[in-house]
Amino acid sequence: IIRGLVGSEMCIRDRSNVIKEFNSLKNDDYIGWIGHATFLIKLGETTIITDPVFSKNAGPLIFGPKRFTEPALNLDELPEINLFLLTHNHYDHQDMSTIRKFPYKQAKVMLPLKLGKYFKRYKDVNEMDWYDEITVNNDLKVTFLPAVHWSKRSLTDTNKTLWGNFLINYKGKKILFACDTGVGNIYKDLGEKYGPIDLTILNIGAYNFYPMAPYKDKSTYHTNPEEALSIARNLKSKKVLGMHWGTFVLSLEPIMEPRQRFKDNAQNYGYKSDEALIFKIGEFQSVSYTHLTLPTTEAV
């Protein structure tokens, strides 16, 4: 219990400060971490949400891992959402309770092939294959790209639906929001074709499944912090922001380990401390694309 309390204080902002900071930035472009893989990203007139999960557990009904930290905002506190991005169908990313209760069903939804059936009450649902591109407006387009991952929600549907990364191109600047991913040569190819990337948001947690998996420090489908940094480097990413840690306990590494390893090893992959970013849950940072000023964070 003590470990949990200390960890929670280290990775989440005080709720009153979250609301205050969010309100102060609501007319600006920003990136904010709600928790796990859920981000709010405002770019011009478009507010984006990624892999929204607001339930108390990541699993069917009341089952699955419980939240270690609460979402930074409640569903009814969200701003109007214009674009809903879903990377894949695992329970800690595709949360049916959130999808049913989501208040902005007029938002444009972009999601992998074969997942549109879960969004029957939504007005604008777009299934995407790898390398599909959708123009949102004159300033913003989104491309769906491969990731080293898999899909499954039941005993009989393994890899029956697609999964992937989203490349957000806003006024010529690029943010790559990653699906859960492992290491693969595909990232060198993507770096050559789409790089340089201005900001990559990558999973850095859920990598120790030993003894269920043969290695204590590696997962085929989830990068550890060092592997995430190597992917960012292969993508020619100028900055990299670690996610997918501190929210649900999905694996056996200590809850705060991903954050520390990510920061400790950044320089080994060519990233300065203000280029390898860690947010607290509930942290919102302004984004200026005029001078390409991407987020910086407090020292950790």
Model-predicted segments: where are they?
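Active-site metal-binding loops of divalent metal-dependent hydrolases
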Residues: P52-F54, N89, A147-V148, C179-T181, ...
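Cap/insert and terminal regions of metallo-dependent hydrolase folds
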Residues: L83, K108-M110, K114-K117, G182-K280
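Acidic/histidine-rich helix-loop elements
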Residues: F54-E70, W150-T156, F209-Y221
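Metallo-beta-lactamase
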Residues: R3, S8-E9, R13-E77, K108-C179, R261-E283, V287, ...
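Active-site metal-binding motif and surrounding structural segment of the metallo-beta-lactamase
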Residues: I62-L111, G195-I201
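Single conserved hydrophobic/aromatic residue that forms the stacking wall/gate
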Residues: I1-G7, I12, H291-V300
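Divalent metal-coordination and catalytic microenvironments
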Residues: I41, D51, H88, V142, ...
